């Protein structure tokens, strides 16, 4: 039976860090059970967030890849003090875009991002790993 191959990465504005590794080597790993997991600030229980993540993946994964790859989306956290210059600049740009929209016009999740900007927030929940772990355990 095919050996599993897993790949996970952080979400940055809907794009998945490391996804190009799967795309580049898909022909080599396509006979394996491929598991892709993402981790980001966006709540994966929110259908709008999932649609945004899926939209980003559709831009880089072919229909064959999407059919073959089992996906799991998890929620993480952020500690601004540990961000590098590039990521700090990205977050500052995102903040400016949100501020232009007006606080009251933002979704509650975006308001929370503004409220915690520059600090530390952690949404990790070990229980949310259960579907991923159960899937891995079910593999032959």
Q: Residue ranges of each PLM-predicted region?
A:
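FMN-binding flavodoxin-like domain, especially the glycine-rich phosphate-binding loop
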Residues: 4, 14-140
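Glycine-rich, N-terminal phosphate-binding loop of Rossmann-like dinucleotide-binding domains
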Residues: 7-11
